[in-house]
Amino acid sequence: MIRFDNLPPEVMQAMCTPMHLILPPSQSHRTGALYLGSFSAILDPTLLTSHAVGALVQVLDAPWLPSVDAHAAQGNKLECYRLDILDSSTADLRPHLEATVRWIDDRLRRGINVLVHCQQGISRSAAVVIAYLIYTHNMSYDAALDLVKRKRACVKPNSGFVRCLQEWERQWRPPAGERPSMRRVMTTPR
């Protein structure tokens, strides 16, 4: 449960904003934009259309969630990748990360704007975006978390996800002496 007393104004503002731009589109690389947000973002077709969101990554455990087909029936064509996982420190995100970040990377490389969302845009979806930055931009966990928090101040992956992401960093970001030259990088985070 999130406690709202004593939260800094920027965190409250971020929690009330449906989605934030994490990586802008790149005209030179013809890549899409990466957004991070909450469930409320997908309930606003005007918002999705105004940001040209063409793909969703839904990181939820919500069998009641309406299908994306209902949104497509309204004239909006959205690709959807669903990751059913609880926001729990005991939930293991690792088995899902590689397929999820590759799916995101594929859409972005095709110039499709992607929104990664969970219920509140604080823990689950933030963890996926951080994993994406580690994997594609060779960022450390701390650097990726810092970038995402600068864009969406309310981000706070749960302790289990933090452990998973630190293991993910060790897997995909070998020690400096063993690092290959640039790999997988497609855009530069701002």
Regions found by a protein language model. Give the residues of each.
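Amphipathic alpha-helical protein-protein interaction segments
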Residues: 37-41, 46-49, 86-93, 97, ...
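Glycine-rich, flexible N-terminal cofactor/catalytic loop recognition
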Residues: 21-70
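PTP/DSP superfamily signal
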Residues: 1-15, 32, 98-114, 120-122, ...
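Beta-strand cores of modular interaction/reader domains in eukaryotic scaffold and signaling proteins
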Residues: 35-37, 55-58, 79-84, 115-117, ...
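Short polar/charged helix/loop
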Residues: 42, 61-67, 74-110, 135
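Short coil/turn segments at secondary-structure boundaries
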Residues: 48-51, 68-72, 95, 128-129, ...
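Intrinsically disordered, low-complexity regulatory regions enriched in Ser/Pro/Gly/Thr
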Residues: 27-30, 47-52, 72-77, 107-110, ...
